[in-house]
């Protein structure tokens, strides 16, 4: 499954581009991805994790493309139900907690960091040792492929 997430008003929107069992031609939908600000990373990771845990496959792997900035601050949202900003230490801690929770449930989680070097320390706090820093997108498939191979070989 390939999906993205963003906040729209009071809602976190999960957009599914491709499902697990879709035909190979569905991969074209991935190119419909557009970036968006305001992301409740912890909630999206928790939701994606529940989807994985419901699957029958033995190995469960979640790959998260991240900029290292979990951030959702309500701006110009009249009558918003959740006015508490999601940013800074609280957002980082929430995201890291959801990652640890999934790992405790034996889901392998890889953070793929494509952000700025100044945010690298935050990425380490969120993902611990299992993250890859992608400086050049051309290396994405090679780096993620190595991680997938390693995860599939463990106890395999």
Give, region by region, the residue ranges found by the protein language model.
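Acidic, glycine-rich A-domain
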Residues: 1-156
